[in-house]
């Protein structure tokens, strides 16, 4: 679990706005060269080695978390704002959401939650629940761990901070009080 990410001017009901801003920011992101390079290499290797085929993903090698949820909870994913990132919605509530992906290396569930900090503020908390796929998945995750911790996670944190700051523009809203 990551430590919470505090954001200025947030309230108890801002989690859906945050999710929409994060998803909108994904399509307009400007990542550092190192991040772009790492993802380009990962997606190229995945294509060449068949890591990301439908058979290796959700509904193929891995049953989706959404399929194992109570129907009323699973249905909440239908109302989530679409996104072009590689994750699939599992569920979305007013203060938490889960998104997942699966491929030949892992089954990953990203949980985002909106939590009170005790001083009247709120923060975004993220947990990644990762189940490596066999020995190869464990070795792959061990190999990429330094890249995730030193390059990807700090860049992701900055991207999320920008998404909140730029939410009015990203969500094409003129009301700056969101």
Residue ranges of model-derived segments:
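Hydrophobic ligand-binding cavity/cleft-lining segments
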Residues: 1-77
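Glycine-rich loops and low-complexity Gly/Arg-rich segments
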Residues: 28-31, 114, 123-125, 149-154
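Short C-terminal domain-edge/linker segments immediately following a structured domain
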Residues: 34-36, 128-132, 154-162
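Short hydrophobic helices that act as membrane-entry/anchoring signals
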Residues: 35, 39-47, 137, 141-145, ...
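Hydrophobic-ligand binding "helix-grip"
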Residues: 72-118
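Short terminal or interdomain "cap/linker" segment that borders an active site or interface and mediates
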Residues: 96-98, 106-109, 116-123, 160-178
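Beta-strand/loop substructures that line and gate deep hydrophobic ligand-binding cavities in soluble
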Residues: 103-142
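A conserved amphipathic terminal alpha-helix motif
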Residues: 139-171
């Amino acid at each position: 679990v990551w430590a919470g990410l505090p954001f200025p001017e947030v309230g108890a009901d801002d989690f859906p706005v945050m999710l929409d801003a994060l998803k909108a920011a994904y399509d307009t992101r400007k990542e550092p060269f190192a991040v772009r390079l790492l993802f380009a290499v990962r997606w190229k290797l995945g294509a060449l080695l068949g890591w990301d085929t439908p058979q290796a993903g959700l509904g193929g090698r891995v049953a989706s978390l959404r399929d194992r949820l109570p129907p009323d909870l699973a249905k909440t994913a239908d109302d989530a704002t679409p996104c072009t990132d590689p994750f699939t919605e599992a569920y979305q509530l007013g203060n938490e959401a889960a998104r997942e992906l699966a491929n030949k290396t892992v089954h990953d569930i990203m949980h985002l939650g909106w939590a009170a900090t005790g001083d009247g503020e709120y923060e975004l908390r993220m947990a990644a629940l990762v189940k490596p796929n066999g020995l190869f998945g464990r070795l792959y995750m061990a190999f990429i761990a330094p890249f995730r911790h030193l390059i990807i996670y700090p860049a992701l944190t900055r991207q999320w901070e920008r998404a909140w700051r730029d939410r009015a523009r990203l969500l094409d809203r003129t009301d700056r009080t969101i």
